[in-house]
């Protein structure tokens, strides 16, 4: 009888261990959740375009005025903004209202900014077309600035195509870029922010989204394609 009891106990133990092992195998892991083909194939319903496709869409059209935002569009300028925050207002974004910060940012701190590859491709394309290139930024205007030279040097923009940077500034409840897009008769405007795209839409021109890098200090990241605009692939760098 004792042997039978021991045998039954052993069987029960084996069953329990086997059940536990199966549970461990079949239970999803929160650390390694895995994926499947459907998830891998899922894409956001966005109007993606390439630089080559944009160039092709302009075939046969005469030279025109085109505009670019600066920060997170043609330059990854977070290093300068990060330094400004640490220097002037570590616990808030008040540095953005400090003229001393803008004097630094507009007069040298863009030496720490990284030119974006997508901007190189776009600007090269527009230079080949003979287009007039403008940069319209929401930065505050300062008495002097070296941003125009920095951009011209970094992107090798000939003087015939380059225009001085337009410092539109930032005003509450107002998209300050609209008047400049209209005044300069721009036909395309590239930008990373919602304001860039809505400025183009308000002017009835083509607004094209460039992706903001995930490690930009400018948060939250915008929802690219939310207005049905074209979004350039691989444009986060």
Curated annotation (Swiss-Prot):
Mg(2+) binds at residues 69, 71, 192. The keyword Hydrolase applies. It comes from Salmonella typhimurium. The active site is at 69 (nucleophile), 71 (proton donor). Homotetramer. Substrate binds at residues 137-138, 177. It catalyses: a phosphate monoester + H2O = an alcohol + phosphate. Its EC number is 3.1.3.2. Binds 1 Mg(2+) ion per subunit. The gene is aphA. It holds the Pfam family Acid_phosphat_B. The keyword Signal applies. Keywords: Hydrolase, Magnesium, Metal-binding, Periplasm, Signal. Its main location: periplasm. This is Class B acid phosphatase. Belongs to the class B bacterial acid phosphatase family. It is found in: Periplasm. GO terms for cellular component: outer membrane-bounded periplasmic space. Changing residue 177 to R: 20-fold reduction in phosphatase activity. Nearly 2-fold increase in KM for pNPP in presence of 1 mM MgCl(2). Dephosphorylates several organic phosphate monoesters. Also has a phosphotransferase activity catalyzing the transfer of low-energy phosphate groups from organic phosphate monoesters to free hydroxyl groups of various organic compounds. Changing residue 196 to N: 6-fold reduction in phosphatase activity. 10000-fold decrease in affinity for Mg(2+). 18-fold increase in KM for pNPP in presence of 1 mM MgCl(2). KM is 0.79 mM for pNPP in the presence of 10 mM MgCl(2). Its cofactor is Mg(2+). GO terms for molecular function: acid phosphatase activity; metal ion binding.
């Amino acid at each position: 009888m004792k042997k039978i009891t021991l045998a039954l106990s052993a069987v029960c133990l084996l069953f329990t261990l086997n059940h536990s092992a199966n549970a461990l195998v079949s239970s999803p892991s929160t650390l390694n959740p895995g994926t499947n083909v459907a998830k891998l194939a899922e894409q956001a319903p966005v109007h993606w375009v390439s630089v080559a496709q944009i160039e092709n869409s302009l075939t046969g059209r005469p030279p025109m005025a085109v505009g670019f935002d600066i920060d997170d569009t043609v330059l990854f300028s977070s290093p300068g903004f990060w330094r400004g925050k640490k220097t002037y207002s570590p616990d808030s974004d008040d540095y953005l209202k400090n003229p001393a910060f803008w004097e630094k940012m507009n007069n040298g701190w863009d030496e720490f900014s990284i030119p974006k590859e997508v901007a190189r491709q776009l600007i090269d394309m527009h230079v080949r077309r003979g287009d007039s290139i403008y940069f319209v930024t929401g930065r505050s205007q300062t008495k002097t600035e070296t941003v125009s030279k920095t951009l011209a040097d970094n992107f090798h923009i000939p003087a015939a195509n380059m225009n001085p940077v337009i410092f539109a500034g930032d005003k509450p409840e107002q998209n300050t870029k609209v008047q400049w897009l209209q005044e300069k008769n721009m036909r395309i405007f590239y930008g990373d922010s919602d304001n860039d795209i809505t400025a183009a839409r308000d002017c009835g021109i083509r607004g094209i989204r460039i992706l903001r890098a995930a490690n930009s200090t400018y948060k939250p990241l915008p929802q690219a394609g939310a207005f049905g605009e074209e979004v350039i692939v691989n444009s986060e760098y």
